[in-house]
Amino acid sequence: MSRIGYKVIKVPAGVTITKDGDNITVKGPKGELTRHFAPEIEMHQEGDEINFTRPDDSYKAVHGTMRANLNNMVVGVTEGYKKEMKLVGVGYRAQKQGEKLVLNVGYSHPVEMTAPKGVTVEVPSTTQIIISGISKQVVGQFAAVVRSVRAPEPYKGKGIRYVDEHVRRKEGKTGK
């Protein structure tokens, strides 16, 4: 049984959390995030600690999810989130043209992508992409969209992958 909903969230100095109806806003040194939360779950703030209580066991899943989401928001406005990706394959390269990310990954045309608001894309080298921002959900979603342009294939391992991702390799046909 998960007890994540009962864990206390420590609010660091410089971060303010305000509740306005069903919306909770977190402001910090890196920016501001607002999210809608279930009205049935009550938020209690005592000094620099926040905890949540639920009315009954039917809200177990929502209880843990709300606590995890608020903790992700606090971490986002203080430290931020970052996904590092690399391109593996002959001729595969990435470049930044203005606000667009341009990927040449073996198609007959370059793939152009625009990062969502609040997400910054850096291309330190032609085979490396760094996606960063304050919202864990938006950063992860955009990284998944970039990866889906050319997901790593199991035979040669070519494609766009996360730096810490392990691609399971398959053996090719043996032939006669």
Curated annotation (Swiss-Prot):
Keywords: Ribonucleoprotein, Ribosomal protein, RNA-binding, rRNA-binding. InterPro entries: Ribosomal_uL6-like (IPR000702), Ribosomal_uL6-like_a/b-dom_sf (IPR036789), Ribosomal_uL6_a/b-dom (IPR020040), Ribosomal_uL6_bac-type (IPR019906), Ribosomal_uL6_CS (IPR002358). The gene is rplF. This is Large ribosomal subunit protein uL6. The keyword Ribonucleoprotein applies. This protein binds to the 23S rRNA, and is important in its secondary structure. It is located near the subunit interface in the base of the L7/L12 stalk, and near the tRNA binding site of the peptidyltransferase center. HAMAP family: Ribosomal_uL6_B. One of its GO terms (molecular function) is rRNA binding. GO terms for cellular component: cytosolic large ribosomal subunit. Disulfide bonds: none annotated. Belongs to the universal ribosomal protein uL6 family. Part of the 50S ribosomal subunit. It comes from the Bacteria. The lineage of its organism: Bacteria, Bacillati, Bacillota, Bacilli, Lactobacillales. Gene3D superfamilies: Ribosomal protein L6, alpha-beta domain (3.90.930.12). GO terms for biological process: cytoplasmic translation.
